[in-house]
Amino acid sequence: MTVVLDTLVAVRRTAMDLLARREHGRVELTRKLRQRGAEPEMIETALDRLTEEGLLSEARYLESFVSYRARSGYGPARIREELSQRGLQRADIDLALRECGISWQSQLEDTWRRKFAGHLPIDARERAKQGRFLSYRGFSMDMISRLLSGRDMDD
């Protein structure tokens, strides 16, 4: 059964249903509503109203996304890139990453321990393997090299 989003009420209801499942950014919500056949003007009107009512919040979405991805073992560079691909503003992303309260050093150590059981690399090949994995996860090379050299992260 196809849902027809031909009224403002239907667009709003669908948007609220999506927001009830999880936080969404405006760009993502717009895309999903367009896929369901809603007119762009109705989407904008409905989303403006939801924003005014505090039901749609980019800040809440950013906070939720950063927290979720960090708990999944991803670093700030990877999270920043994913949010950029979702159409969010770079300044908003950077602010969310700064204010999230996550210790990226601790996050790096936890991710490394889960993957490599806390074993420092014994040769260049293993060091490269661990470094590639952590870099792919979005941690800076500076943080990675400090961790893999066995130096205290707070130095």
From Swiss-Prot:
InterPro entries: RecX_HTH_1st, RecX_HTH_2nd, RecX_HTH_3rd, Regulatory_RecX, WH-like_DNA-bd_sf. GO terms for biological process: regulation of DNA repair. It comes from the Bacteria. GO terms for cellular component: cytoplasm. Its main location: cytoplasm. Transmembrane segments: none annotated. Pfam families: RecX_HTH1, RecX_HTH2, RecX_HTH3. It is found in: Cytoplasm. Keywords: Cytoplasm. Modulates RecA activity. Belongs to the RecX family. This is Regulatory protein RecX. The lineage of its organism: Bacteria, Pseudomonadati, Pseudomonadota, Gammaproteobacteria, Pseudomonadales.
